Amino acid sequence: MFLSLCLMVLALYLLYKWALPKPISSIPYNPPALQSLFGDIPAMIQGTKANNQTHMDWIIQQMKNHESPIIQLFLSPLQRPTVILADFRETQDIMLRRKDFDRSTNIRGLLEDVIPDHHIYEQTNSVFRTHRKLVQDVMLPSFIQKVAGPAFHSNIMRLVRVWDLKAQIADGSPFLATQDIQGAVLDAVYSFAFGSYYKSSTTLPKIEKLEKWNGNAENSSRNAPQSDKPFDFPDVAFDDLINATIDLAKAPQGLQGSPIAKLQAKVTMNMPHFRRVRKIRDDFLRGSLKSAVSKLPSEGGKSDSQAVTSAVEQMVLRETALAQTENRSPNYFSTMMQGELFGLILGGFDTTSTTTLWGLKFLTDNASVQKRLRQALQSSFTKAKAENRSPTFQELAVARIPYLEAVIEEILRCAGATPALQRLAKVDTQILGYHIPKGTDVLFLTHGPSVWTPGFEIDESRRSQTCQAAGEKKDQCWESHDISKFKPERWLGQKLPSNNREKDTDATETAEEFDGLAGPTLAFGLGTRGCFGRRLGYQQLKTSITILIWNFELLPCPQELSSYRTIEGLTSMPEHSYISLAKVDLTTT
């Protein structure tokens, strides 16, 4: 009996020792993590709560504590450590030139019930390539110019009407912009993805309610504006599809940094509420696909891509063409079709709305930048200014305004909407001279040292051969003294006017030119697995920032409503997104 008890204790002890975290040799780590089955989790929970930080803030602090661009953390029980890298050049090299990393498998567990059968969590294989073929047309410049861009512009113009009314009612008081921006962007992405099949709207009910509110003297007197306090506008009820989409977008909130994120996601998505939400999503997707298929020409007829009015119609045409090429029957209602369609919605909705909200904060808190941007816009769209109207999408699409491009690039750099990229080591490999075993997850920070804060000093000999071979880019870094400042000018260079370049090489007259490669930024990732919607994302930000700054002056908000704390979800959005508006008078500016 005693011997059996001793053997049991010994077995439990050996099991405990086996389960303790095991570090990768030489990479810096937190020694206390090796003494707990939960690794770094307790310290991370305590640190984030005590300092009101996100888990990504805490990770960056660990790198500073170790004074190292690469560390390892134990973020899940019974799992190998996650390696963290904060260096733009090495990240760029891995994303663009090296084949020993691929998409991490972790993201599938977080998103597969939110966005079913989507390419974002597939590894780079034949399945991934099949998915991308299906959606490749919706990111072509022709589709953006004819369908996606105009749809986005029209919905941002509806937002202008909402804010015209709110500015009149609030009379200088701040109000929360989050729902307005998210709603307008959601309407926009649904409009270009589904066209006339999308019957809902978040913005039109607001306009109707605000027009009634604005004309009601009783409401106006009961809610007298107070410039130092936020003005609360009445809520507007949305339909089931809009509510379902918003709920699915919010589902990943709280999972970032969780040691059991995949289990939490699975449990959450199988609760009664989310089963109902998923059914609403799936019913809409199938119904829209059915309607789009019904528009196909009869057998023997030719498809007219010029008549396409939505992404769902474009994808149905693409599936038809792929089926003919592959000598198979088209599968219009596959989970892949549905997943890729809904991915257009969530991807475009969450990233664009979050980045726009950050952009409004930066422009509010940097009045000189806002003023210069408005002047640049008015100087470029002279006809729109003379006619006292907003620029049309057609005018926006062809405009090349260096300062606008610089502002957008700086918003993307500073926002950190996607604060990290995750990859999986496919083979035994190295990063900065450290051994990385096959199967190790690596987190590449996009909003930390070398991008948003000063980088670490790294011996050039520790870099990979491909990184060293690209050494002509090693001076592509931001000045440390203002790297954390919102400064669009960092993206502008000087050029000689084209008519002087050949005629007079000694000419001193110069003009500003946007340089998208001026320094480190990772907002859209890099390489094959970079953001698929990058081209559309730029166009959407160009439209939203232009139209909103054209129509409104963003006034300072009280400090207590202007923090830069973030909420972690699919993206990292600002906790405080308050704005105070004054209408721009084009006749006097």
Swiss-Prot record:
Originating species: Fusarium sporotrichioides
Cofactor section: heme
Tell me which residues bind heme: 531
InterPro entries, A to Z: Cyt_P450 (IPR001128), Cyt_P450_CS (IPR017972), Cyt_P450_E_grp-IV (IPR002403), Cyt_P450_sf (IPR036396), Cytochrome_P450_monoxygenase (IPR050121)
The family database entries (PANTHER family) matched by this protein are listed as:
CYTOCHROME P450 (PTHR24305), P450, PUTATIVE (EUROFUNG)-RELATED (PTHR24305:SF232)
Family assignment?
Belongs to the cytochrome P450 family.
Look up the signal peptide feature and give its range: 1-21
Keyword Plastid part of the UniProt annotation: no
Which protein, by its recorded name, is this? Cytochrome P450 monooxygenase TRI13
**Function in brief:** Cytochrome P450 monooxygenase; part of the core gene cluster that mediates the biosynthesis of trichothecenes, a very large family of chemically related bicyclic sesquiterpene compounds acting as mycotoxins, including T2-toxin. The biosynthesis of trichothecenes begins with the cyclization of farnesyl diphosphate to trichodiene and is catalyzed by the trichodiene synthase TRI5. Trichodiene undergoes a series of oxygenations catalyzed by the cytochrome P450 monooxygenase TRI4.
What does the entry say induces or represses the expression of this protein? Expression is positively regulated by the trichothecene cluster-specific transcription activator TRI10.
